[in-house]
């Protein structure tokens, strides 16, 4: 869709560069927009696998630094979108140069030097859809988990505005002698610490959303009158974490899921509403798994951004033995 829009704009303004011409001009001229101390730097393009996508990353390498040097990455595709919107190459370059310099100033020294002895406590999980992320998986340590894959990231910063960090690639893992099993053990400990999990009734999630949208308190209260009388077995829960980022990682923690399932009192279906949260409900109250799968698939297509989609499948958690399985198309 983006490139359809790009072609439409280009046809209306023949003076604008196409993507390939824009990319070449960035490679030739971007350094000239940076302060003088960056004049001896080189600029490199790297394919950067993102969740459900792959972007062209642009990195600046100072003279004498190894290629493993960790520079902030910006993306050619996103700069080109900005160029199409403002029709000014110079403006896009100036804005990006300011952003890059500010990012470098605030990067911790252990990140810049890729000092993994001090970064070990910042390594976390990220679960992604295996089928939709073949390019990412091919280039990084990972392990399969049902229809998903576990990859590893280093978290640079996390706050209410978002998460910044980078993917641990095969190149990084080899250079630092990091085995996948070692990464898994580190991430198992760190993820729960950096992103503390939380669970709440879906009504509480909806109340907070309505409050953000400016709905009056009395109207919110009226909308959920009587919800406390809903039997435990019929209640629906949302699992995420304190920052509401990558909350679906809870799938890797049986103890987190079991706590919610026990409060419901039956086996439960787990719906991956996005990479950031899970919805948990009783298999007895909501017995038709095919309808739940359709609900997840339709919600993904119509309401969830591509980068936030986890899976069109649903999962079943056993209250008896704590096992978790992917529910197949044929399950009913």
Identify the role of each PLM range.
Residues 6-17, 76-82, 162-176, 241-246, ...:
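Charged, low-complexity surface segments at secondary-structure and domain boundaries
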Residues 242-332:
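C-terminal structured domains
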Residues 2-52, 56-58:
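N-terminal alpha-helical "arm" segments
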Residues 34, 38, 195-199, 268-269, ...:
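Residue-level signal for secondary-structure boundary elements
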Residues 19-39, 207-248, 301-302:
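Terminal alpha-helical anchor/extension segments at protein ends
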Residues 46-238:
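Charged, alpha-helical interface segments at or near domain boundaries
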Residues 26-38, 93-96, 100, 187, ...:
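Hydrophobic, Leu/Ile/Phe/Ala-enriched alpha-helical segments that form helix-helix packing faces
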């Amino acid at each position: 869709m983006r490139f359809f829009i790009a072609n439409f704009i280009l046809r209306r303004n023949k003076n604008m560069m196409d993507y390939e011409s824009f990319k070449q001009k960035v490679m030739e001229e971007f350094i000239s927009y940076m302060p003088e101390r960056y004049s001896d730097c080189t600029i490199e393009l790297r394919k950067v696998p993102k969740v459900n996508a792959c972007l062209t990353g642009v990195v600046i390498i100072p003279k004498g630094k190894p290629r493993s040097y960790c520079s902030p990455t910006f993306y050619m595709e996103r700069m080109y979108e900005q160029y199409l919107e403002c029709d000014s190459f110079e403006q896009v370059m100036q804005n990006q140069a300011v952003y890059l310099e500010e990012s470098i100033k605030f990067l911790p020294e252990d990140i810049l030097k890729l000092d993994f002895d001090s970064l070990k406590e910042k390594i976390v999980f990220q679960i992604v859809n295996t089928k939709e992320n073949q390019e990412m998986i091919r280039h990084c340590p990972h392990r399969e988990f049902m229809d998903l894959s576990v990859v590893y990231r280093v978290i640079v910063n996390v706050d209410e505005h978002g998460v910044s960090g980078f993917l641990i690639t095969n190149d990084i893992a080899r250079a630092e002698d990091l085995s996948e099993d070692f990464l898994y053990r580190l991430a198992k400990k760190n993820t729960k610490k950096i992103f503390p999990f939380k669970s709440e009734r879906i009504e509480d999630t909806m109340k907070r959303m309505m409050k953000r949208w400016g709905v009056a308190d009395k109207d919110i209260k009226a909308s959920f009158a009587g919800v406390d009388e809903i039997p435990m077995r019929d209640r629906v829960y949302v699992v995420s974490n304190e920052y509401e980022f990558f909350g679906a990682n809870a799938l890797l923690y049986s103890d987190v899921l079991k706590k919610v399932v026990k409060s419901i009192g039956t086996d439960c279906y787990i719906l991956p509403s996005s990479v950031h949260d899970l919805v948990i409900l009783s298999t007895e109250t909501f017995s038709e798994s095919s309808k739940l799968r359709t609900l997840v698939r339709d919600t993904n297509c119509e309401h969830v951004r591509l980068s936030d989609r986890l899976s069109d499948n649903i999962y079943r958690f056993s209250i008896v033995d704590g096992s978790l399985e992917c529910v197949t198309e044929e399950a009913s």
